[in-house]
């Protein structure tokens, strides 16, 4: 398949990329030439197997559109200490970027996962993410595969108008901190027609995310699609306008999840929609938890002060491997408001069935039928 955009092509082989050697210098030279080019331009890593150290593609670029096409299989150094930063392939301050191709970015993360439990050790050094997108506008990422990242596969920070289409993310279900796509402080994010199998959240939405639309995502193994955690730090920006629709979860720990810390600084998440979702043997299909406190790092006595409002759950069906299929635990200090719960049909076939639910600190409006029945205190 040819290069997808018209314009000049900057093939890394022409800049000294050699099969067995580290191609990072060749990639950076090709990027500099493409970025300085007036018209549309594309950096091409053609079919083949390559080794590549850390690379950072910096903008702004002269042309209005620039492509980065990966058709080869590119491997990161296996040793986590070979990285200066927390990103292996990073893109900064670029308008009109398209990252595409039939290739694979292989983070060779197996060594890092053994040391990666930063949840329990706040001072640990984060391993490198496969892909970092920072301060981008009008970006498209399509068709590529991220394999075995050392940490998050894809991190999106302070971006505006970025789309992920037909992306594949793969790592074992046992890999630690390998979130598929993490979004923070970004507006206008679309994730569609994408397959994510990993050891942590398939998609996680952090503070400051607005207008994020997630459709036609297959998630599993993994920890589901999460909003949060919110309220861990001071001055977090609010979350607004998150839609998760037409997605399938298979063998995951969670389906859709909202998590906020107790005893939190003030904050908010509003306009959250979870609709037309299929759960295949999911441990916690629906979980809204405002007492999220992993590893006992906080006190649950003081309530979360993250205000959750305008939340819709509708047409969520399938099978739960946990008896409590729906958990809605809103903050006792700041109850959820304007929650709508429509059709839910989740079955549990294990011991002590059928499925049950818990619901507290909210008075939802119900429509249609809920299985299990949901009674809120």
Swiss-Prot record:
Keywords on record: Allergen, Cell wall, Cell wall biogenesis/degradation, Endoplasmic reticulum, Glycoprotein, Glycosidase, Golgi apparatus, Hydrolase, Repeat, Secreted, Signal
UniProt GO BP: cell wall organization; pectin catabolic process; pollen development; pollen germination; pollen tube development
UniProt signal peptide: 1-5
Similarity comment: family membership: Belongs to the glycosyl hydrolase 28 family.
Gene behind this protein: plaa2
Tissues in which the UniProt entry reports expression: Expressed in pollen (at protein level). Expressed in stem, but not in leaves (at protein level).
Sequence ranges of the PbH1 repeats: 159-184, 186-207, 209-229, 239-260, 269-290
Post-translational modification: Glycosylated.
Temperature dependence, free-text field: Optimum temperature is 50 degrees Celsius.
Record's keyword annotation contains Oxidoreductase: no
Cell compartment(s), UniProt: Secreted; Secreted, Cell wall; Golgi apparatus; Endoplasmic reticulum
One Gene Ontology MF term: IgE binding
Glycosylation sites: 211, 345
Biotechnology: Could be used together with allergen Pla a 1 for a reliable diagnosis of London plane tree (P.acerifolia) pollen allergy by skin prick test (SPT) in most patients of the cohort of 47 tested with a sensitivity of over 90% and a specificity of 100%.
Active site: 200, 223
Enzyme Commission numbers on file: 3.2.1.67
Broad enzyme group: hydrolase
Subunit structure as annotated in this protein's UniProt entry: Monomer.
Catalytic activity: [(1->4)-alpha-D-galacturonosyl](n) + H2O = alpha-D-galacturonate + [(1->4)-alpha-D-galacturonosyl](n-1)
GO CC field: endoplasmic reticulum; extracellular region; Golgi apparatus; pollen wall; vesicle
Family annotation (InterPro entries): Glyco_hydro_28, PbH1, Pectin_lyas_fold, Pectin_lyase_fold/virulence
Protein known as: Exopolygalacturonase
Alphabetized Pfam families for the sequence: Glyco_hydro_28
